[in-house]
């Protein structure tokens, strides 16, 4: 019991409530070890499904067998009771095998996601944890090159035998006090700290209610979270320890939603859950959120339809030591202590505060972990003896502020120390201040989290905010660089001579209010004017004179107000800011001197492979060779009459037209880009070049022209010699030949560029008239060769060419059936570009649309830019000819559209795990959908002159919001870069699998060749038609 001194200051009521509220119920835990709970269900119900990854399943019996196999393999390479195994895997059906195999071997696992964990954290965890071995997948083999421990591959460790006696579980002496896992908490100062968690810590949460959350056989449980996050242990181990079915979410947003729709219990952070509407997930019965503060609106929305649990607890108290079942309309709290745990709210002297008053939250009981690995001083600082339990157990200082509310639950009120969460990451404010102090000339700095935004305060006042951010960005990741900076000559002080952070906070609030006034003045412009006619103006944030009064103190009573000159720079203000990334020349500083991978193979072989015999040309050649073989065959057989050659002409025209049909193109793209990113890279890099299918179109087009020349010659010969071919057929043939020659001549790249309008007109009208004449020629030729006594209709229906001509005609006509005139909402970005908004359809990412103001004369294709969560799409039209210049000067309010959204080269993005996306100028338009969609980690490189003046703050800011580490290179300021070398730097830094580029033809070909010749998959548009 607690000594009377610790509770003597409380009223009798508060003393009673201290015990009532702060001590959880005593409940017996049925299992002492996590894997023992799993084995109970594996033995009781071996046929039940343990894991279901989008249809790939493992039963409890098979999972148990595989885990035993892995445990035996680990024992054979030196793993013993008490060992630690670094587990570098990913969210998949194999994850439970790895976890249980390690536990059955008597070891603890260190969970690291091979797709996410940084090299520095991986190296630190391997050494700091004292791992006996590293367990990984073959796909992550490169990440463990030079590892200081043996590497075991999960892919190879499972024996093929289905005989349960083949791999016997090793002798098990694990107890509740042994380690189950070690979680490395993220930090921005120093190195990550490993937290030692025991089996007893975990089973106390997952094997009894409420932490059990109703998990039982037949219940489906989501596995949505990063496996390195301790919250993920709740869903993974909780499901397996209770006989439920664990459902990993897959790699795409489509898979993610499919899993969410299929589960009964959903684990999530509030940020992950926020975009989703519970109406869309009727199967979900229970949701538990943790990891960050939960907004009331989110809790109310989901709480109205499901059991909505809000949980809280740092890693050091085992995932969560308080939980609350939210009732819509009530305040959001984190509940009370879970069974066998305690929760205290104490003052600075470690005495309980009265109910309703704010203090520091401490946790105690069965969830308290062993402490920090290899950090005894840090452990003794945060873990202390629990004087209230008085049984020798420990309690932990969470560093969080909270208070007990009247219903006996805790209200979380933020952190008392300098560690905060920003965008889901832990950030040490002192580390941010230290990073800002690395800027030349800075004499002092501090950082505060104010209304969810990271602010930096720096002295003296003559330091550029952009220089401060550049310096901080060299030390800290993007999320730990202040988005707003205030510079001043002196910091306000408290009575004790310390920096008065309350006054600094007030300064920040007043500067935000001043900025809000400026925005309100801009917003007063009528909406229709803002949409159309005013190009954005980039202004510099003004110097703001702020008068901040000191709070009275012993040495400042009666003092006058202190005037502080503060320079405000807001990184997220579209009117007054430029992203720090646009101004940090160090990102590309010295890139031309980087050591780059050598080009593979000899120069001749490289050029043959990547330039002369590109996949496009190989497909062209295949079509051409097939036609050559057909020519040889009919010559040998002497079956080259005009009728047969005419059929071959039609077959080639059919293929050429169909390979440009929107539905056919989309089908090719959907099939080839559906290959998952888990497949070997050589398969994915080949399938991703599906956009080279234009080679089939060109091959068939050229072949049809050559066959038409042969047909013309043969038909003329037959006509002269009195054969079957009539004069009218030959006459029509010469007209068709002339039209096709005209199309081919104007399609020649040099002429097409110089005479683009002429090309458009000839290509369209000669193509239409040629199609009509093909019908006439076909009918004439059929009549010429009509067998005696047979009706024309009977012959036609039996002739394959007749049906080919019908199909290709329908293919050409079909898009015109989807012709419509739609409303356009223009947004003028500058005198160089306009953004056109449409709301009649929402196309998928990676597609382009055709628009026109004169549908019978010309059509123009632009990348469609859908915004996630918003109906409709936009197009970015930049100055590149008469048509674009006309619509930038006079933005349209209506345009014609036809056909369906058609996929382009960036449909391939989800096939890769990490990519560098390169765009020059308006090439950012086709790239934007993939950037906004955020389906994979990517690094964006955008080069253009004066991007904000050219494309406007709104587009630039949206790109930076979706990809905060995007590199924006101002060619007006820095000149034209060496795009190959700059791209190679980003590929190396980002550890990218592949590169995609949207640019002009010469630069696209240069970058693609520069990457491919070094073994890096690269993709860019083909200019073939």
UniProtKB/Swiss-Prot annotation:
NADP(+) binds at residues 685-688, 769-771, 840. InterPro entries: AA_adenyl_dom (IPR010071), Adenylate-forming_domain (IPR052979), AMP-bd_C_sf (IPR045851), AMP-binding_CS (IPR020845), AMP-dep_synth/lig_dom (IPR000873), ANL_N_sf (IPR042099). Its EC number is 1.2.1.-. It holds the Pfam family AMP-binding. AMP binds at residues 332-333, 412-415. Residues 682-900 are annotated as: Thioester reductase (TR) domain. The keyword NADP applies. It comes from the Eukaryota. SUPFAM superfamilies: Acetyl-CoA synthetase-like. Residues 38-422 are annotated as: Adenylation (A) domain. GO terms for molecular function: ATP binding; oxidoreductase activity. Residues 556-638 are annotated as: Thiolation and peptide carrier (T) domain. Keywords: ATP-binding, NADP, Nucleotide-binding, Oxidoreductase. Contains three distinct domains: an adenylation (A) domain that activates the substrate amino acid which is subsequently covalently linked as a thioester (aminoacyl-S-PCP) to the 4'-phosphopantetheine prosthetic group of the second domain, the peptidyl carrier protein (PCP) domain, as well as a reductase (R) domain of the ferredoxin-NADP reductase (FNR) type. Belongs to the adenylate-forming reductase family. Adenylate-forming reductase, a natural product biosynthesis enzyme that resembles non-ribosomal peptide synthetases, yet serves to modify one substrate, rather than to condense two or more building blocks. The A-domain preferentially accepts L-serine, L-alanine and L-valine as substrates. The natural product of the enzyme is not yet known. This is Adenylate-forming reductase 03009. It comes from Coprinopsis cinerea (strain Okayama-7 / 130 / ATCC MYA-4618 / FGSC 9003).
């Amino acid at each position: 019991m607690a000594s009377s001194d610790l509770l003597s200051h409380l009223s009798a009521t508060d003393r009673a409530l201290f015990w009532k509220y702060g001590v959880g119920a005593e409940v017996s835990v049925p299992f002492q070890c996590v894997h023992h709970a799993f084995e109970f269900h594996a033995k009781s119900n071996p046929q039940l499904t343990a894991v279901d990854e989008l249809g790939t399943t493992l039963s409890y019996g098979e999972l148990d067998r595989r885990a035993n196999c892995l445990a035996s393999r680990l024992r054979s390479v030196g793993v013993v009771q008490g060992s630690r195994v670094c587990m570098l895997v990913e969210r998949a059906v194999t994850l439970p095998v790895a976890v249980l195999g390690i536990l059955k071997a008597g070891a603890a696992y260190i969970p690291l996601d091979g797709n996410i964990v940084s090299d520095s954290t991986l190296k630190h965890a391997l050494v700091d944890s004292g791992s006996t071995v590293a367990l990984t997948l073959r796909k992550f083999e490169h990440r463990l090159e030079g590892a200081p421990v043996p590497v075991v591959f999960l892919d190879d460790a499972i024996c093929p035998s289905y005989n349960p006696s083949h791999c016997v579980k090793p002798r098990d002496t694990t107890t509740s006090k042994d380690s189950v896992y070690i979680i490395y908490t993220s930090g921005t100062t120093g190195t990550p700290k490993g937290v030692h968690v025991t089996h007893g810590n975990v089973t106390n949460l997952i094997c009894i209610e409420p932490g059990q959350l109703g998990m039982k056989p037949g219940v489906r449980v989501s596995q949505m979270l990063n496996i390195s996050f301790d919250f993920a242990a709740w869903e993974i181990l909780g499901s397996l320890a209770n006989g439920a079915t664990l459902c990993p979410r897959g790699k795409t947003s489509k898979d993610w939603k499919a899993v969410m729709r299929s589960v009964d219990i959903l684990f999530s952070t509030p940020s992950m859950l926020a975009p989703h509407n519970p109406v869309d997930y009727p199967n979900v019965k229970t949701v538990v959120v943790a990891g960050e503060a939960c907004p009331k609106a989110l809790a109310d929305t989901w709480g109205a339809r499901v059991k909505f649990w809000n949980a809280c607890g740092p890693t050091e108290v085992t995932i969560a030591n308080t939980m609350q079942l939210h009732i819509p309309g009530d305040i959001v709290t984190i509940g009370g202590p879970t069974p066998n745990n305690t929760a205290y709210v104490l003052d600075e002297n470690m005495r309980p505060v009265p109910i309703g008053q704010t203090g520091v939250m401490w946790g105690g009981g069965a969830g308290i972990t062993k402490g920090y690995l290899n950090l005894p001083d840090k452990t003794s600082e945060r873990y202390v003896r629990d004087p209230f339990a008085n049984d020798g157990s420990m309690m932990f200082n969470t560093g969080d502020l909270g208070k007990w509310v009247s219903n006996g639950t805790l209200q979380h009120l933020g952190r008392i120390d300098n560690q905060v969460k920003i965008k889901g990451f832990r950030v040490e404010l002192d580390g941010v201040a230290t990073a800002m102090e690395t800027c030349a000339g800075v004499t002092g700095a501090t950082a505060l989290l104010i209304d969810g935004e990271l602010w930096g305060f720096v002295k003296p006042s003559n330091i550029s905010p952009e220089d401060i951010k550049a310096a901080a960005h060299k030390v800290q990741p993007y999320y730990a660089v202040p988005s707003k900076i205030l510079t001043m000559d002196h910091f306000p002080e408290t009575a004790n001579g310390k920096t008065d952070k309350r006054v600094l906070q007030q300064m920040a609030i007043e500067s935000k209010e001043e900025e809000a006034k400026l925005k309100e003045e801009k917003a007063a412009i009528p909406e229709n004017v803002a949409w159309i006619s005013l190009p954005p103006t980039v202004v510099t944030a003004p110097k703001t004179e702020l008068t901040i009064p000191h709070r009275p103190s012993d040495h400042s009573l009666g003092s006058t107000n202190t005037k502080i000159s503060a320079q405000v720079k807001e990184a997220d203000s579209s009117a007054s800011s430029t992203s720090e990334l646009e101004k940090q020349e160090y990102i590309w500083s010295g890139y031309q001197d980087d050591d780059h991978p050598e080009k593979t193979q000899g120069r001749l072989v490289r050029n043959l492979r990547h330039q002369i015999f590109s996949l496009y040309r190989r497909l062209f050649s295949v079509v051409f060779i097939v036609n050559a073989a057909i020519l040889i065959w009919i010559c040998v057989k002497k079956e080259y009459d005009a009728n047969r050659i005419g059929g071959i002409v039609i077959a080639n025209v059919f293929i050429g037209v169909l390979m440009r049909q929107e539905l056919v193109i989309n089908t090719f793209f959907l099939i080839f880009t559906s290959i998952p990113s888990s497949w070997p890279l050589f398969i994915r890099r080949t399938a991703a070049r599906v956009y080279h299918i234009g080679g089939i179109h060109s091959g068939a087009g050229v072949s049809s022209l050559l066959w038409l020349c042969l047909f013309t010659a043969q038909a003329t010969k037959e006509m002269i010699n009195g054969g079957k071919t009539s004069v009218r057929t030959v006459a029509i043939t010469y007209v068709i030949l002339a039209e096709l020659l005209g199309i081919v001549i104007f399609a020649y790249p040099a002429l097409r560029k110089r005479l683009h309008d002429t090309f458009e007109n000839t290509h369209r009208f000669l193509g239409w008239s040629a199609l009509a004449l093909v019908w006439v020629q076909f009918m004439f030729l059929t009549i010429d060769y009509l067998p005696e006594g047979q009706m024309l209709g009977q012959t036609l229906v039996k002739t394959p060419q007749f049906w080919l001509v019908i199909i290709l005609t329908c293919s050409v006509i079909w898009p015109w059936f989807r012709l419509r005139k739609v409303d356009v909402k223009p947004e003028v970005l500058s005198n160089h570009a306009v953004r056109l908004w449409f709301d009649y359809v929402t196309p998928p990412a990676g597609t382009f649309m055709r628009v026109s103001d004169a549908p019978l004369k010309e059509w123009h294709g632009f990348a469609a830019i859908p915004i996630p969560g918003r109906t409709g799409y936009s197009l970015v039209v930049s100055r590149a000819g008469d048509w674009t210049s006309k619509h930038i000067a006079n933005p349209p309010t209506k345009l014609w559209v036809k056909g369906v959204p058609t996929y382009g080269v960036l449909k391939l993005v989800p096939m890769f795990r990490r990519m560098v996306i390169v765009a020059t100028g308006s090439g950012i338009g086709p790239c934007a959908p993939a950037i906004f969609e955020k389906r994979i980690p990517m690094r964006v490189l955008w080069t253009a002159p004066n991007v904000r003046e050219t494309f406007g703050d709104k587009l630039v800011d949206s790109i930076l919001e979706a990809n905060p580490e995007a590199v924006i290179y101002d060619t007006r300021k820095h000149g034209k870069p060496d795009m190959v070398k700059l791209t190679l730097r980003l590929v190396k830094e980002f550890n990218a699998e592949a590169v995609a580029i949207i640019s002009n033809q010469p630069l696209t070909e240069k970058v693609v060749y520069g990457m491919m010749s070094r073994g890096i998959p690269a993709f860019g548009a083909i200019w073939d038609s």
